[in-house]
Regions:
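Short, surface-exposed secondary-structure junctions/capping segments
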Residues: 96, 190, 237, 331, ...
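Serine residues within intrinsically disordered or low-complexity segments
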Residues: 260-263, 392, 470, 477
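Conserved anchor residues at repeat-unit boundaries in beta-strand-based tandem repeats, strongest
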Residues: 6-16, 30-42, 54-63, 77-88, ...
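Long terminal segments
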Residues: 451-479
Length: 479
C-alpha cells in the first residue's frame, strides 16, 4: 500500500479490499469505491487533479467497462466503454464547446464508425474514424448547409467523394487529395454549367471539358491553374469554334477559327484573343487575305486575293484598310502601284494597262488624280500637268508621240481652256485663248518660221470674219 496517500476503508490481510476512499497527499479525495487486492476494482469514482472526475467500472486499478467522465463543472466529458484505462468500444464524448461524438473508440480515440454533432445537436460528421480522425467513408456537413459524402484520410477529404449544395445539387464529384479537388472530377457551377476533367489544388489543371447548363461544349483542352492554357477547342453559342493554342484563357499562339459550318474563317497567329502576327482570313464571298495582323485587323504587309487566286491588292495595311504603299489589280487587268489611304489611291502612284504600259503617273487624292501628273493616251500622246478630281485642270502640257509639244497652257475640266499655245504637226502654231479645246477669243496663228498667219478673234475654232489677215507680208481686208 502506498503510504504517501491516505486510505479509509476495508482492509483484508493489510490490503485494500471492499469499499474505501483514497486521498491525495494534500487531503483531496482521489478515489472512492470498490477495491480488490489493493487496486481499484468494480465500481468507483476517480477524481483528477484538474477537477474532472470519472464514475464507472474499474479492473486491476484501471478504468475498464462502463463509465462516465465529467468536467469539474459537472458536465459530461465522456460516457461509454473503457478497456485498460482507455476509452475503447462504444461511447459518447463531449467537448467544452458543446460538440459531441457518439460511436466507436479505440485507444482513447474515435476509431470505427461514429457521428459527430455540433452544439445545436446537428450532425457534423457521420462516418468512419481511424485514430481520432475522419478516415474511410463519411459524410460531413458544412456551416452553409453544403455537405460532402466520400472518402477520408487523416481527417481530410482524400480519394473519391461528392460535394453537394444544401439543396442536394452536386458541386463536385471526383477525386480529392488533402481536402482539395485533385485528380479527375466533375465541377458544377450554380447556373448549371459544369466542367469534367483534371484538377489540382482546387483548380482546373490538365485536360478537361467545360459545358453549358444544357450540355453543350464550351471548351475542350488543356488547363493550367484554373485557366485555359495549352492546346484546346473553344466553342461559341452560334456554332463557330477555335482550335489551337491558348494562354491565360485567351487564344495565344497558332490556331484556326471556324464558322458554324466547319469552314475555316482564319488560320494563323493570335495574341490575347486577337488575330495578331501572320494569318490567313477567308471572306464570305470567297476572297481571302494572307499577311500581317494586329488587334484583329489587317496591319502591316499583306495580300488580298479573289476566290480564284488572283491578287486584288498587295501591300501595306493599317487598321484593316489599304494604307501606305501597295499594288491594286482591277478585274479588267489594269493595275495601280503607289500610295493608299483609307482604301483609296492617295499620294503618288502609277496606273497601268494590263500589258504593263503606263496610263497615268502622279498625284492622287481620295482615289482621284490630283496634283501633278502624267497621263498617256492610247495613241502615244501624253499630258503632263495639273489635275483635280480626276480631270486635267490648271497648267499643263500635251506632247506628241515623238515628245514634241502639242499644247501648253491652261486646262479646265480636261479641255484646253484659257490661254495656251498649240503646235500643229506641220510646224504651224497658235498662241491665244481657248475654250472647250477650241480656239476661242483673241489669238494668233504662226507659220513655222514664226511669221503671222492670222491674228485676230476666233469663235469655236473659226476666225471671226471680217477681220484683218496677215499672210506672208500681204495685208488685205476681208469683207
Amino acid at each position: 500500500m502506498n503510504t504517501e496517500e491516505r486510505y479509509e476503508g476495508d482492509l483484508i490481510n493489510g490490503m485494500r479490499n471492499g469499499q474505501g476512499k483514497l486521498y491525495y497527499r494534500n487531503g483531496n479525495i482521489k478515489y472512492e469505491g470498490e477495491f480488490a487486492n489493493d487496486k481499484f476494482e468494480g465500481t468507483g469514482k476517480f477524481y483528477y487533479t484538474d477537477g474532472n472526475y470519472y464514475i464507472g467500472q474499474f479492473k486491476n486499478g484501471l478504468k475498464h467497462g462502463k463509465g462516465i467522465e465529467y468536467y469539474k463543472n459537472g458536465k459530461k466529458k465522456y460516457e461509454g466503454d473503457y478497456a485498460n484505462d482507455k476509452k475503447e468500444g462504444e461511447g459518447k464524448e463531449y467537448d467544452l464547446d458543446g460538440y459531441y461524438y457518439i460511436g466507436q473508440l479505440k485507444n482513447n480515440s474515435f476509431h470505427g464508425k461514429g457521428i459527430l454533432y455540433d452544439k445545436n445537436g446537428k450532425i457534423r460528421y457521420d462516418g468512419e474514424y481511424v485514430n481520432g480522425k475522419f478516415e474511410g467513408i463519411g459524410k460531413y456537413y458544412y456551416d452553409d448547409g453544403n455537405y460532402y459524402i466520400g472518402q477520408w484520410k487523416n481527417g481530410l477529404r482524400n480519394g473519391e467523394g461528392v460535394l453537394y449544395f444544401k439543396d442536394g445539387r452536386v458541386i463536385y464529384d471526383g477525386e480529392f487529395v488533402n481536402d482539395k479537388f485533385d485528380g479527375r472530377g466533375k465541377f458544377y457551377e450554380p447556373d448549371g454549367g459544369h466542367y469534367i476533367g483534371q484538377f489540382k489544388n482546387f483548380l482546373k489543371h490538365g485536360r478537361g471539358i467545360e459545358y453549358t447548363s444544357d450540355g453543350k461544349k464550351i471548351y475542350e483542352g488543356d488547363f493550367a491553374y484554373d485557366k485555359k492554357e495549352g492546346e484546346g477547342t473553344c466553342y461559341n453559342e452560334e456554332g463557330s469554334y477555335y482550335i489551337g493554342q491558348i494562354k491565360n484563357d485567351l487564344f495565344n499562339g497558332k490556331g484556326k477559327y471556324y464558322s458554324s459550318n466547319g469552314s475555316v474563317i482564319y488560320e494563323g497567329e493570335f495574341i490575347n484573343g486577337k488575330y495578331e502576327g501572320i494569318g490567313k482570313y477567308y471572306y464570305d464571298d470567297g476572297n481571302y487575305y494572307i499577311g500581317q495582323w494586329k488587334n484583329s485587323l489587317r496591319n502591316g504587309e499583306g495580300v488580298l486575293y479573289i476566290q480564284d487566286g488572283r491578287v486584288i491588292y498587295e501591300g501595306e495595311f493599317f487598321d484593316d484598310k489599304f494604307e501606305g504603299n501597295g499594288k491594286y489589280y482591277y478585274l479588267d487587268g489594269k493595275y495601280y502601284i503607289g500610295q493608299f489611304k483609307n482604301f483609296l489611291k492617295h499620294g503618288i502612284g502609277i496606273e497601268y494597262e494590263p500589258n504593263g504600259t503606263k496610263i497615268y503617273e502622279g498625284g492622287f487624292i481620295n482615289n482621284k488624280r490630283d496634283g501633278i501628273g502624267k497621263y498617256y493616251n492610247e495613241d502615244g500622246q501624253y499630258y503632263v500637268g495639273q489635275w483635280k478630281d480626276d480631270t486635267s485642270v490648271g497648267k499643263g502640257t500635251v506632247y506628241y508621240q515623238n515628245g514634241n509639244v502639242k499644247y501648253e497652257g491652261d486646262f479646265v475640266n480636261g479641255k484646253f481652256d484659257g490661254y495656251g499655245k498649240f503646235y500643229e504637226e506641220n510646224g504651224e502654231y497658235y498662241i491665244g485663248q481657248f475654250k472647250n479645246s477650241l480656239r476661242h477669243g483673241k489669238g494668233t496663228i504662226y507659220f513655222p518660221d514664226g511669221s503671222i498667219k492670222y491674228d485676230g478673234e476666233f469663235v469655236d475654232n473659226i476666225p471671226n470674219i471680217p477681220n484683218i489677215i496677215s499672210i506672208k507680208n500681204h495685208i488685205c481686208s476681208v469683207k
